[in-house]
Amino acid sequence: MRIARRWVGAGLMVMGGLASPALAQNLFVVTATGNGNTVTVGGDSIIDLVDSAVNTQDQFAQFQDVNATFALNYGGIADAITITKNSGNTQASLTFGPTGTTRTFTGTSQDDLENQIEDYLKKQGGADFTAFLKAVNAQSVIAVSDGNPNATTARMAGWAFDRFGFSADQRKAYTLRPGAAPAPQGAQGGGDPDTGADAPVMERANAGFQLYVGASGQSYSAGDFDGESATIFGAADFNFSTRVGLSLGSFLAYNTVGDADVFHVGLTLGVPVRLVLPGEATPFTWQVTPFGQVGGSGSEDIGAGGLIIGGGITSYLAWHISDRWTLAMANQYTHYEGEKLSFSDFEIDPGVSQGVMKHGLRVSCRLTECWYAYAGASYSTFTDDASIDSWVSPAVGVGYGSIAGSGVQIGFIGDYGDDYSASGFRIAGNLVF
């Protein structure tokens, strides 16, 4: 059955969105049966593998003129997609295993059959594919768009949580300068406990414009597969006052799984509002940040990709116990929806409708006037069906922050959930102008 590569590739881009172990060495496996023969072929590129199968090429050439069934083990889900066709290549059926949806096509010739299937992929099949993706995203430990700590939704939520919550102290709402008021508790600057010298008299000043840049890298294990991940991120921040600011940030991530490559990108616009600032009577900082996001992912090898839009709110509450010690709590909720993309008469929808909740605690200790150490952990959970519905992320490291507000942090990061573990490093710096 010589089905054109153009609709095979586009169809699989729509049907993509996950990858997990089919065999120990392959992400995807096709098993063909017909005329008493069985052939099983695996690979890490779904488009190349299924293109060979449905076009009865290479190892599948013997099934060209016989009744045959092709079953795709898609990311460890047996019979995720099953295609049957007759010996004359004029009738075929397509079944999505996770949803039970079956579509049958009957043509007057092989060309007519191909045209019917192509029309289905372009027009009527969108809802079937979206339902299929939503079902399989909830079953794959290394789905691309959703359902695990390495997916796009988790990355988008993690970026906002780190920026506005867990590591919110790197973003400076204000700087300190000599003034007529005592230095606020919890702010840098204070008396020398060894010499008994008086604390410098400081007052808050608007931090103004600042740039934030960083990178992280991890190696991870998900199910039977291992991979690596690298992320670069950055943000531009402006404070209208010591209480209200604007933050525009983004990240670009790349990860491998098996021999497949995956790319993620996200953009976040937030409005940090400092409801409480530390002072003599209130040793607390409380910041609330509503934000909106747009992101997406793509993988030619896995045939996955799609656009995701969402937003949420982050709360950061810090208790400045003393001049040295600070205990902070961060809480966040985000919600994401997949958005359709159209190209060459095809539509791609990642099948995402997901919420993410994150809660974290972090303690920091000032070692010197500028150097400090920190340690903490966060707990994340998906509110909708997911293959890994929750995970814990510890972090520990050291940082340097000047009174002017600029500084840098470097430390260990990890993610640990059911059938998933990742560990690596993070480095980030903030420059106040």
Segments from the language model and where they lie:
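Transmembrane beta-strands of outer-membrane beta-barrel pores
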Residues: 215-221, 238, 250-258, 273-275, ...
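Membrane-embedded beta-strands of outer-membrane beta-barrel proteins
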Residues: 232-234, 267-271, 311-315, 359-361, ...
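Cleavable N-terminal export/targeting peptides
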Residues: 1-206
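Long, hydrophobic/aromatic-enriched structural stretches that serve as scaffold segments
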Residues: 228-273
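Short loop/turn motifs that connect adjacent beta-strands in outer-membrane beta-barrel proteins
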Residues: 199-208, 238-246, 275-286, 319-327, ...
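Outer membrane beta-barrel transmembrane domains
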Residues: 209, 246, 339-433
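Detector for outer-membrane/organellar transmembrane beta-barrel domains
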Residues: 282-289, 293-380
